[in-house]
Regions:
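Conserved C-terminal helix/linker of AAA+ ATPases
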Residues: 46, 98-104, 125-126, 165-181
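C-terminal engagement/docking regions of AAA+ P-loop ATPases
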Residues: 135-194
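Conserved catalytic core of Hanks-type protein kinase domains
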Residues: 22, 87, 131, 153, ...
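Hydrophobic positions in the central parallel beta-sheet of the AAA+
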Residues: 3-4
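Conserved AAA+ ATPase small/helical "lid" subdomain
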Residues: 96-150
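Alpha-helical structural signal
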Residues: 16, 40, 63-64, 80, ...
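Canonical AAA+ ATPase core
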Residues: 7-15, 23-118, 158-163
Length: 194
């Protein structure tokens, strides 16, 4: 139920279009036969910097379908030394037999159902809407976030609250998830990018 798409912005447009169709409709047609995706169907994607050769900028409508964007930085000195040690001692390979599930499918479905019960005060719904609306009126933003961003921020805030051991959302939850939810949905003006 989990699909990892590596280097999504290197895929041809036709492949990207098929991927985004299944993301939106949760089904795909192959040779005239429609296949429904499972209820936990999730797509994770990696992306190379756009300035690299052979990459294509993803259209805004397609980027908008991803819940969040998390940017990975280079490893710290200590982390890079650890990588070198693993390669030097040949312990960098992970055996599939050694991997243990962190959670069962049933537990994940239960958490998802519980997430739907996480309380969000109406003032916080207004707060989310206000944040997203501000992206549409800011002089620094050429293209603001769509209503899909509001829904994503709500869902991410509820999930984050649950991960913090709470059954209610706080303004801090929203502030925490906002950059991850918004960064790939906004197009800044040329002046703002400088």
């Amino acid at each position: 139920d989990i699909v990892l798409v590596d280097e999504i912005n290197r895929a041809p447009a036709k492949t990207q279009a098929a991927l985004f169709e299944v993301m939106e409709e949760r089904q795909i047609s192959i040779d005239g036969i429609t296949h429904k995706m499972g209820e936990l169907y999730t797509i994770l994607a990696t992306q190379n910097p756009v300035e690299q050769e052979g990459t294509y900028k993803l259209p805004e409508a397609q980027l908008d379908r991803f819940l969040m964007k998390i940017t990975m930085d280079y490893p710290s000195l200590e982390e890079e030394v650890d990588i070198l040690e693993r390669h030097h001692t040949n312990t960098s390979l992970i055996r599939l037999d050694d991997i243990k599930p962190a959670i069962t499918k049933e537990e994940l479905l239960s958490l998802r159902a519980f997430m739907n019960q996480v309380f969000v005060d109406r003032t916080l719904l207004q707060y989310i809407a206000l944040i997203v609306q501000q992206t549409r009126t800011s002089k620094a933003v050429y293209l603001g976030a769509s209503p899909r961003a509001s829904v994503a921020m709500l869902q991410a805030s509820k999930a984050y609250a649950l991960l913090q051991g709470r059954d209610f959302v706080t303004p801090e939850d929203i502030k925490f998830v906002a950059p991850y939810v918004l960064q790939h949905r906004l197009i800044l003006t040329a002046e703002a990018e400088m």
